[in-house]
Structures are given as structure tokens and as C-alpha cells.
Amino acid sequence: CFGGCSAPPVASNEVEKTEVPEKPASNNDASKGSLDEITSIALNSECSKTAHDVQGKPPKSYLKGSALSFAKAVCNPLSETTEIASQAVGDGSKDALAHYGLKPATAHERLEVVYSLMLGSAARESSWRWCVGKDPEASNTSAETCEAGLYQTSWNSRSASPALPRLFQKFKTDKSGCFATEYKGATTCSDANMKNWGTGEGVEFQKLSKECPGFATEYHAVMLRMRRSHYGPINRKTSLIKPACTKMFKDIRIKIQSKPSLCQKLSKS
């Protein structure tokens, strides 16, 4: 994490419960059943068996949620956030892909690598826990700078791109794409982490980052391309990119391209 309000990377009162039975897709609409075709790719991938240093293997909940967020991006290539996340590699002082020395050739490949890096970022920033708030030992309680959610982002990051405040406003009124059931899974959270700090829109940002992990993920995708310096583990390159996880996202993209009807089901979630 980066700055005074970041959470410790591992120790917490939150626990990802082990091996719970798989639940059906998070909507009673029977037409959404085939979203399991997307999440099953993640759950059965080599990425699901790949350890990220001391953080271990990614939990089922994060794999399912990130699979659906990535699928949404693939289904909406002209959306503002997808275009930024998949744009050509830029300046290494701002762009995480350039900072890592990566040069994916196509927009598809750049999007896959960004989501793979986000998986490594979540490992370091929150141990893949959606509900992480500010470090309880930190004295700073400003709504502008207190970090929240999977990727420990703070509201003062919004100046990185005009797309970010627009994304925030969109998700405030439309929770489709949160994929909260998938991301949250069996994770339980302490009151200390669920608390939001300060006043104004920064409090709403903290709350939305926790309660709507899909928002936090799309926001982080833009941040990685526009202001990677916000994140200490990215700056230090301790957030890892695992080839098995990049391949997992590629396999999801290929599945969607072979079955475009999945995009219609995603749009209802």
C-alpha cells in the first residue's frame, strides 16, 4: 500500500473461508446460468493453483469476480474505462505496463495483462479482501486520502483521468457490474475495516469501493495505466504478473468471442 491510510497486506480479522460449495450465479434470472461458463474457466485454470508469494493462491471469490469484470470489459471494448485500460503503452512514470517493461502488441493483450497485474495488486494490497479499509493504526482520517477496497485506492486519485469521476458517478446510481456476490464469497469483515472515514464524496468513494468490488476493479484498471505511482507495490514491482493468470484472462476472452450471447447475460448482472 502507499500512503498513511493503507491497510497491512496480510494480518487482519478477515478470513477467506476454505473450500465452500460453489453457489450458482448471483441472480435468480435463469438466463444467466451460463455465466458459470465464464467463472468456471477461472476456477479450473492454472492461475487458481498459482501462489502469489506469501499471499498463497487467489481465493475462488476473487477469481470469479475478476473473471466477470474482465468479461464485461471484453464485451464493452468502446467503454471509456476499457479503452484506457487497453490503450497503447505509454510513459513509465504513469503507466504500470511501461514501468514493468511490458509491451503487449494488441489491445486484447494489454487488457489481459492489466487484469493479470490487478490480481497481483489485490494480493499485495488487500490479500484479495473486498472490505479492507484504512490501517487502524494510521492517524490520518481524511476522506481524500484514506484508502479502501481490494486495491487500496483513495479518492484523491480521481485527478488521474476525467474518466474516474464519471465512473464513480455511474456506479453510484447503477450497481450493475458490481459482481458483489462473486467477489465477496465467504469473506467476513471486521467493523474496523468496514468503517469509512471523513466527510463528503470521499466517504462515498470508500463505501462504494468496498460494497461494489466491480467498481473498484474498473477504477484500478484505469489507475494502472494513468497513475501507477498511487500504489506502493506497483512502484516496487512486488505486485506480480503470473503467466498462468494472463492466460486465464485470454481463455475467458476467447470464450466470449466464440459465444457473444454471454455479453447479453453479463449486461443483466
List each model region and its residues.
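Short, low-complexity, disordered segments immediately C-terminal to signal peptides
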Residues: 9-24
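Cys/His-rich zinc-coordinating "finger/knuckle" motifs
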Residues: 12, 54, 252
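Peptidoglycan-targeting cell-wall enzymes and recognition modules
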Residues: 31-223
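Active-site or metal-binding loop neighborhoods of secreted/extracellular toxin and effector enzymes
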Residues: 203-269
